[in-house]
């Protein structure tokens, strides 16, 4: 809230888009983002496809990788379409998730990043979760949902 008691609104919100479970967590984040977005603001859905190491990529048909990217693009478009009347953009990146999401947020001029978290597994204790890395390194507010 501002000092006058009015709710703080955001001009540019980046949502880290998870597409498992038909994008249910991303759809929930989009619904929440709509309540936080300033009139005329922009929501950017960012999905990161893990980079396939070169030695593995050589054995995967290019058609398979292209088909996966089209599938992700279609899923993001469907989710974006559900936010009727809102300015929603979609971005697909390849690479390390937290760095890619932070880069997309910088490019979008985001003043809020939204990301879903999960209950930590054993690997999260050793290498850390994407959400934790984003919270530590983001130069803007981060809203973590479960």
Give the label of every model feature segment.
Residues 35, 81, 106, 136-137:
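Solvent-exposed polar/charged
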Residues 3-59:
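Small/aliphatic-rich secondary-structure junction motif
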Residues 62-74:
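A short acidic, glycine-rich active-site loop
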Residues 44-46, 89-93, 143:
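General small-molecule cofactor/ligand-binding pocket signal
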Residues 137-146:
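Short, flexible loop segments at boundaries between secondary-structure elements
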Residues 1-9, 81-113, 120:
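Structural beta-alpha unit
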Residues 115-133:
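Glycine-rich, Arg-bearing micro-motifs that act as flexible, cationic patches
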């Amino acid at each position: 809230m501002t000092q006058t008691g009015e709710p703080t609104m955001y001009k540019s919100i980046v949502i880290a888009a998870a597409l498992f479970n038909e994008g249910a967590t991303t759809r929930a984040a989009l619904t929440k983002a709509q309540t936080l977005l300033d009139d005329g603001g922009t929501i950017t859905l960012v999905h990161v496809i893990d980079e396939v190491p070169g030695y593995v990529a050589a054995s995967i048909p290019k058609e398979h990788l292209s088909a996966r990217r089209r599938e992700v693009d279609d899923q993001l478009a469907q989710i974006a379409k559900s936010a009727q009347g809102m300015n929603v953009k979609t971005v697909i990146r390849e690479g390390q998730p937290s760095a890619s999401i932070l880069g997309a947020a910088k490019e979008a001029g985001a003043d809020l990043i939204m990301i879903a978290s999960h209950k930590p597994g054993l690997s999260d204790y050793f290498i850390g979760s994407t959400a934790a890395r984003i919270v530590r390194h983001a130069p803007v507010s981060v809203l973590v949902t479960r």
